[in-house]
Amino acid sequence: MLFEQIARNKRHTLYVMAAFVILLAVIGLAVGYVFFNSAIAGLLVALIAAVFYMVLMISQSTDIVMSMNHGRELHQADDDPELWHIVEDMALVAKVPMPRVFIIDDESPNAFATGNDPEHAAVAVTTGIQARLTREEMEGVIGHEMSHVRNYDIRLQTIALALTAAISLLVNWGMNAFWWGGGRRSRDNDRDGNGAQVLLMILAIVVIILAPLAASLVQMALSRNREYLADAGSVELTRNPLGLISALEKIDDSQPMQAADPSSAALYISDPFKAKKSWTHLFDTHPPMADRITRLKNM
């Protein structure tokens, strides 16, 4: 089961990378066509941006994400012995290297894992989760995060985060160029465009508008699916579903975070902003907490 899940996540990583390139290519073509009168130029800029952003995220993802979420790193066990040893124990049970450990100064209880692979992983917890949870509950939470590390979920989420951020940046770049350029392409089309050109223009604009939404939906779907798997993985590591159940109940009954970055919301064990759930759940970063707890109770 475990090795099948790791292999599946590695395949999903390739699929997400392919989607990343395809979406960026499409948005690049659209931005180039609408704003610069050259779809090919837009495509080249998008591909260059994709390569740069992927290299940056893969090589620097941990530091970037931790900086965005105001995490401070523990460098040795003496910095926080209890947290350090819980992470160390769970890493040993999960058979993964000891990850880097960070603390986020925030009263709301929450935690997340990030990185590129088990050899370059990091775990962050808030001061709020340390204050409210017992050791048994903390083991359940850290076991959940170690499952993300062990199953290569962290790589999948790093790529999804890059996908969402890069497309948003490309759209913003195109819109800024449009406004500063005075909408030159639109005026040219108004003067000498035919019906087909107008249709292409409308289609390109629709693509530009919907691309960030599509990227966000992919990221959210990935996040929802991985939370169920990590919950089950935590129980496998700790042999104690009650610890995680109690932890999730306390996390759910808390105030929103202040230090969390919106683009990292999907990484956390629970939605850090306590956003109202949509009835379709398409726009939710996490599955309903009640469903997660019910599944754990049925194990």
Swiss-Prot record:
Membrane topology: Multi-pass membrane protein
Active site as annotated: E145
Keyword Translocase among record annotations: no
Residues annotated as binding Zn(2+): H144, H148, E227
Tagged with keyword Cell inner membrane: no
Cofactor(s) required for function per UniProt: Zn(2+)
Membrane spanning stretches: 16-36, 38-58, 159-179, 198-218
Biological process, per Gene Ontology: proteolysis
EC number(s) from the headed UniProt entry: 3.4.24.-
Family matches, as Gene3D superfamilies: Metalloproteases ('zincins'), catalytic domain
CDD domains: M48B_Htpx_like
Example of a GO MF term: zinc ion binding
Matches recorded under InterPro entries: HtpX_protease (IPR050083), Pept_M48_protease_HtpX (IPR022919), Peptidase_M48 (IPR001915)
Localization terms from the record: Cell membrane
Enzyme class: hydrolase
Main location: membrane
Family to which this protein belongs: Belongs to the peptidase M48B family.
Identification of the protein by name: Protease HtpX homolog
Organism: Lactiplantibacillus plantarum (strain ATCC BAA-793 / NCIMB 8826 / WCFS1) (Lactobacillus plantarum)
Gene name per UniProt: htpX
